[in-house]
């Protein structure tokens, strides 16, 4: 008698019908689906955020600081998505030097601290969040109107089409939602993300 945990292939052999549900379905789900049904309109009836391309030099520069300051001045929230822990630290220090309070979210933060940060976000005590992978999903804050993404065209697992769409979605709860993609060229993943978001905006 085999008494081991089923792997994915074992599961597929034992299941006749599977329903995949995802906001960002991968090639596997699409290729293995006989029928695909779209749900593009959001429950809050707000369109997906507008995508704006910024030069790579914008990230960490004076114009970015001004945009962050303008956004929080309206009582709204900014999410800054970095490419590395070093970049997170640099941006956190930069904001501090410009008298802008911010919090950092990363995988080492305990659940209680994460809940506290989310509570302070929704309560308006925190206006800027900086992170890497933790900003992809699960942070639904209606005050977030600006997402800034570092090196949006970089070719790695943090900048796939799916990840870019997920990070952009953090600004989808606010009617003023915008996403600044910082890059000096357009990668295929970034182009795909922009195309998908524009498609959704058109339908919404």
Residue ranges and their predicted role:
Residues 162-194:
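Conserved segment of the helicase C-terminal RecA-like domain
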Residues 1-2:
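SF2 helicase catalytic motif II
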Residues 130-152, 165, 178-180:
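A short beta-strand element within the Helicase C-terminal
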Residues 14-17, 34-35, 46-50, 75-76, ...:
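Short glycine-/polar-rich loops that comprise or flank the Walker A/P-loop
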Residues 82-87, 103-119, 130-137:
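Conserved helicase motor
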């Amino acid at each position: 008698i085999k008494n081991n945990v089923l792997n994915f292939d074992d599961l597929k052999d034992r299941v006749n019908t599977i329903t995949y549900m995802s906001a960002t379905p991968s090639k596997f789900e699409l290729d293995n689906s006989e029928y695909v049904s779209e749900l593009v309109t959001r429950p809050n009836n707000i369109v997906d955020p507008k995508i704006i391309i910024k030069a790579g030099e914008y990230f960490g520069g004076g114009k970015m600081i001004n945009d962050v300051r303008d956004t929080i001045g309206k009582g709204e929230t900014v999410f800054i998505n970095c490419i590395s822990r070093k970049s997170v630290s640099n941006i956190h220090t930069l904001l501090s030097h410009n008298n802008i309070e911010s919090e950092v979210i990363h995988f080492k933060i305990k659940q209680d601290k994460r809940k506290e940060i989310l509570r302070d976000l929704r309560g308006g005590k925190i206006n800027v969040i900086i992170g890497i992978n933790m900003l992809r999903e699960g942070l639904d804050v209606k005050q977030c109107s600006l997402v800034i993404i570092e090196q949006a065209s970089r070719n790695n697992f943090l900048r796939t089409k799916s990840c870019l769409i997920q990070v952009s979605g953090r600004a989808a709860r606010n009617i003023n939602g915008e996403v600044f993609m910082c890059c000096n060229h357009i990668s295929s993943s970034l182009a795909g993300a922009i195309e998908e978001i524009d498609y959704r905006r058109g339908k919404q």
